[in-house]
Amino acid sequence: QPSLPLLKRKQDYQLCMNYECHPTNGVYTKIAFFDRYGDVIEEKIEKMKIFDFTYPDGSYTYQVSLLSAGFESLDFYSFSIKELNRV
């Protein structure tokens, strides 16, 4: 199982999904943040392929999932997480 990159608490990031879906809005992206005991601290569900998020304080790990919103076909290629610079 591939591992996700380590993220810094309170840092802003951009998640970019690379997939083709039919119909176009047939899938959502979910990112869930967990504390050291495995309890959910926060969840974010997005329709967009590219979105920003902040890694919450107190997070120990996180999980990225795809949720069906009625898609008929899905070709998943990759996703990336990049750190955003603070102003």
What are the language-model segments listed below?
Residues 16-20, 32, 65-67, 80:
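Residue-level recognition of well-ordered beta-strand positions that form the cores
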Residues 23-35:
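Beta-strand acidic-aromatic groove motif in beta-rich domains, primarily in extracellular
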